[in-house]
Every structure is written in structure tokens, then in C-alpha cells.
Amino acid sequence: MLHYKRILLKLSGESLAGEDGYGINAGVLDQYAEEISEARDMGAQIALVIGGGNIFRGVSQAAANMDRVQADYMGMLATVINSLAFQDALERKGVFTRLLTAISMEQIAEPFIRRRAIRHLEKGRVVIFGAGTGNPYFTTDTAASLRAIEIEADIIVKGTRVDGIYDSDPEKNANAQFFPDISYLDVFHKKLGVMDMTAITLCSENSLPIVVMNMNEKGNLSRLLRGEKVGSLVHHEGV
């Protein structure tokens, strides 16, 4: 019995770069695709949002002298590149997928239509959402929250390279405090940087829980779906 039937998995573009620091690491891509394939085989309905920071970040130093709107559109295109790579990796494992983009790209993807996305999920396809929200000034974290609410996901899973939420970077501070369970309000007040404030607000207002977990730990996604305690859970206090 699955603890979560329909999930939205959010991955950063940087995570796809692995140790390379830039671009797409084939080994990481294959590992993540394998994790998603196993979760899909358990009967979970899985949607995916991937950032584009391994290729281009609209708020980066490289874009400092660019028009912000132009830079954000470049970032959206970067997410589509990652989405196409992920689609290929999944389909090589026999997983049926659909790529839906917020900006029309009819030669390579379907336009985002909510009912169509839900129907794909019901048919067992992994749905990848590309191009963010299609609007500048909104992050892929916000896109993930929005899409998760639209498809009525049970939870957002944010895959990272650390075990969950800490009060400081555990890769730099060995004494960082781990939060296995935390409220949306505490995420705000402690400024923990789980997601941007717009994304957290959307989740809070729609009572959509968030799990932050280590995507590099093999089997974590499957364990989470079975109801095992994995990573950090963000939810309403007392729930």
C-alpha cells in the first residue's frame, strides 16, 4: 500500500550536473531515472519539475547585466533542455513519459493543459513539466508548487544532495541542526531556504506537504512512498 499515490518530484538543475558542476552528468541522470522507474513500478503517479541552473540561471552573476525578463526566459529554456534529457533517460528504461511545457514548443512537447496532465498520470505515464510557469520572475520552486496543486498531488518531494532540512549548510557546518519535522511558519521565521517564499506560501495555503530528502541515497524515493521516515517533512503545525 502506497503512503503517497501521486507525487511531484522537484529536482534542481545543479543536481543533474553532479560533480561536474555544469551541464548534465550521464551517471547522475541514469541514477535518478532508475529511482523514478522503481517508484513508478510500485504504482505511484509521478510528475517532475527540473530546474535549469546547471545550464543557465536567470538570477546568476552571468546574467547580471542582462534584462531580467530575457534572462528568465533563457532559464526556462534551460529547464526544457534538462526535461528532454530526463525524458530520454526514462524512456530508455521503458518508462512512458510526456513532456508538457508552459511555453508552446509543439515540435518537442505538449502544451500544459491541466486535465491532460492528470490523464497522463492516471495512465501511468511520468509527466515532466518544463519551462517553469512560463512567466519571468517566478522560480522553478514556485512552478513545482503550482503544478503540484493543479494536479492534486499528495506531496512535493524536493530531491537534494543532503538528508533534509538543516539550520545551516551541513556540508560546511558539522554541527548544523537537523529538522525531521517542521511547520511552514518555522521555515519562514528561520529563513531556512527550503524553497522560495512564494512556493512555500502556495504550499501552506493549500495544505500541500513538502518532503526534502537526499535524492542521491539509493532507494529513498521508494522508501518514502512506502511510508518510511525519510528526510524532513514540512507541514502545518499539529497536523
From Swiss-Prot:
Quick one: where is this thing mainly located?
cytoplasm
- Annotated catalysed reactions: UMP + ATP = UDP + ADP
Q: From the UniProt record, give the pathway where this protein acts.
A: Pyrimidine metabolism; CTP biosynthesis via de novo pathway; UDP from UMP (UMPK route): step 1/1
- Listed binding positions for ATP are 10-13, 53, 57, 160, 166, 169
The record's subcellular location field reads:
Cytoplasm
Q: Name one Pfam family in it.
A: AA_kinase
Give the EC class as a word: transferase
Q: Where is this region: Involved in allosteric activation by GTP?
A: 18-23
| Job description of the protein | Catalyzes the reversible phosphorylation of UMP to UDP.
Domain of life, per UniProt, equals: Bacteria
What keywords does the record list, in alphabetical order?
A: Allosteric enzyme, ATP-binding, Cytoplasm, Kinase, Nucleotide-binding, Pyrimidine biosynthesis, Transferase
Q: Name one GO biological process term.
A: 'de novo' CTP biosynthetic process
Query: Transmembrane residues, as ranges?
Result: none
Origin species, per record, is: Chlorobium chlorochromatii (strain CaD3)
Cross-referenced HAMAP family: PyrH_B
Protein's name in the database: Uridylate kinase
Inhibition and activation profile: Allosterically activated by GTP. Inhibited by UTP.
- Which amino acids does the record list as binding UMP? 52, 72, 133-140
Q: How does it assemble?
A: Homohexamer.
Q: Which CDD domains match?
A: AAK_UMPK-PyrH-Ec
Q: Which Gene3D superfamilies match?
A: Acetylglutamate kinase-like
Q: Which GO terms describe its cellular component?
A: cytoplasm
Q: Does the keyword Kinase apply?
A: yes
EC number in record = 2.7.4.22
